[in-house]
């Protein structure tokens, strides 16, 4: 019984450290939707052009932005396509407006992320 418990613990640690627990490889994806700030959307449902000024201020303070997909209402947290780089300012400037973002989609637990490889 002790061997089984130790084996299970070692396997769990291996999976956690190997990244296998994070799901499949990233998938290329293009999504069209509204650029939102995650705080105000999550806490108050704030979105649209009427929330644009506040959303821009939140993004400037470092609150992550996301893309609210048209038709499905899926929220993709937007990530830079290179480590330690910001999301492009031109995309942040589309706060409250429509944008199309192409990149790689990652799903971790119940969260969805999308790198910003290009946008329009």
Where are these regions (language model features)?
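OB-fold and OB-like single-stranded nucleic-acid-recognition modules
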Residues: 22-120
